[in-house]
Amino acid sequence: MTDDAVAIQKAIDRCSAEGGGLVLLSRNHVFLSGPVELKSNVELHLEATAMLKANPDEGIYRLSAFGENCGEGMLWLWANDAENISITGKGTIHGNGIAFMGAELGDSYELKPLADQTFDPRPHVLTLKNVQNLTIRDVTIKEGAYWTVHLIGCNEAVIDGINLLNNLKIRNGDGIDLDHSKNVRIANCHITSGDDCICLKNRREFEQYGSCHDIVVTNCVMSSRSCAIKIGSENMDSIYNVVFDNCIITGSNRGLGIQNRDEGTVTDVVFSNIQLDCRLWSDVWWGKAEPIYVTSYPRANGNHKDANWRFPKGQIEGRCGEVSRIYFNNITALSENGCFVGGDEPGKVKDIYFNNVRVKLVGNTGNIMMDKRPCKGEGFVKVGRDELLKMRVPLLTEHAQVEVR
């Protein structure tokens, strides 16, 4: 088994050193590769039928995708402090995800037991940190073992026309994560992911990059075992000026979600012209088929493998920030559950507007559960289906200000 990483890295290094250009992965060839660093002014172009595939040897992935936090996976294709990077073409980037999983269950794979609970060897597909002027266009990215496209502190990024096709049974298999990033446009993408399809957040490991803002997502089709479009749960800064428009969501455990669990704020977000259907999956996945979900609750204490990074340094518990000025316009949903909007105290979740939101309850009978996880205290709230059926929009609220128009 030949690893092509050295040859690919040499080509990228030379191209960047000579002022930039194109590194071509030619058609009808599978390039098996360990970790590769992408560099400034280089376009990585995959011709149709070319495939770049992750080496299944866990031992070669030694650089953490989260800096000092080694409990959340390793780097495969990555860039740090770069500019003018492009990933293009009709070829495929294959994360070889199943090779890093444990046994197959009903609607998920088990995670392999870790000898060291602070070190997770699963490789992320693309981790791009502090990249200015980034383009990802037309490629197929599939079968990630962990997060797939992670933008950290990036500015002026375009993701257009990609097929991101993860195995729906792989946990933590996020599609696109925008972390402390700004001025990002995502359009015309097809995304299937076991975890969230598109997620905005501000993780504590990268606090130096500031807030996440000025994001537009449009014309995408998504399916998720978790939440198709999510903001949170990690948010130690602010997320604002965000638009999700003209999207379709199918077969997801949750549709549109804001899950604020840290001290950061979420404001001025618009969800518009979205058609979705939600269905219940197992409790392995957060969510109970809520088509719309807006919450702010303090994060639970616990012994999670990265627990030292969940709260501000030196603290063993945290608080949650305000969620306000959130607009849902022209939303149509078929779902096994109603909507949930809640906060830990009055005034925390406010100015939430439902304008022309239509939700039809299907399938589930009897009592329904709303899922507040991850949070301190009880993770589920029980509500009667008959109670929801009486409402124009089936909606449960807790300490939240919502206006239905």
Give residue ranges: language-model regions.
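Extracellular/periplasmic carbohydrate-active domains that bind, remodel
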Residues: 1-405
